Amino acid sequence: EITTRLVGSEMCIRDSSILSVKRIVEAVDEPVIVVVSALGGITDKLINTSRMAAAGDASYENEFREIVYRHVEMIKEVIPAGEAQVALQRQIGELLNELKDIFQGIYLIKDLSQKTSDTIVSYGERLSSIIVAQLTGAEWFDSRKFIKTEKKHSKHVLDTELTNSLVRETFSSLPKRVLVPGFISTDKMTGEVTNLGRGGSDYTAAIIAAALDADSLEIWTDVDGFMTADPRVISRAYTINELSYVEATELCNFGAKVVYPPTIYPVCHKNIPILVKNTFNPEGVGTVIKREVSDPQSKAIKGISSINDTSLILSL
């Protein structure tokens, strides 16, 4: 049996929670593939830094220094002083130097192509995944080698058949604990870095889970699962224990930003249950998403979500 765990949507992996991530990963006895996202806020900082550089704003260097600081301090916080920490700092430093050179190039030519932008944002997951791999003792695998996209109508979309084949080949002999950067992919023809879209780490985990017929997909984020309503609006909102794939998809499409909507299709097709849990409250029940729901407390209205000027009431 294989469990695929997405540890943290991008907003979840914060400096304060990374040791919680370690405990979550180490709690699994069976083989586990862990997919991680960038440290919280780093993807936005990467995008902002690149735009500042392209606009000729020299203060992009200050923004970049914050990115460097976050990762360097993270390593000092979670990896004990010694040879392992020094080696990791060197490895992360090399990636950060690559990134620095890219930003300097953008600043000099005052241009930011989509290709360069895709390369830049990939560093968020590459950096965080290497740190978490060291922290958890997991074997690091480069998702750029097996998550493949193709260009259709000027957009990069997943090549499912090729990706499934490469995932099965890559993990034909599965180590006890595997660490994979989410979100990142490459063009199957050119090898250029692409990505699966914001929230794509969820999708990466689902793709791998489906390709390997995993026993389950766990998504560890910063909420207790799907709620009956937005708790910031409805104070009495509570966690929904079970949802069907269809119900979860509808809620996600109408504003419930718990799971990236494309995540659900690959595992739905294979009838692999999704468990959504809170990194900061691992003892919480969370929400199970599966084909058939057997919630004895089912009510006429399961949950309410909304987007601007639009609302969805989900009835049974």
Tell me what each language-model feature is:
Residues 1-8:
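Single conserved hydrophobic/aromatic residue that forms the stacking wall/gate
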Residues 2, 189, 304-306:
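Sterically constrained small-residue positions within well-ordered secondary structures
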Residues 8-264:
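Nucleotide/pyrophosphate-binding catalytic subdomain
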Residues 182, 274, 313-315:
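Preference for bulky hydrophobic residues occupying beta-strand positions
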Residues 216-218, 273-276, 281:
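Internal nucleotide-binding/catalytic subdomain
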Residues 267:
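Acidic-aromatic/histidine active-site loop/patch
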Residues 270:
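Conserved dinucleotide-binding and phosphotransfer motif residues
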Residues 285-316:
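A conserved regulatory-domain signal marking ACT and ACT-like small-molecule sensing domains
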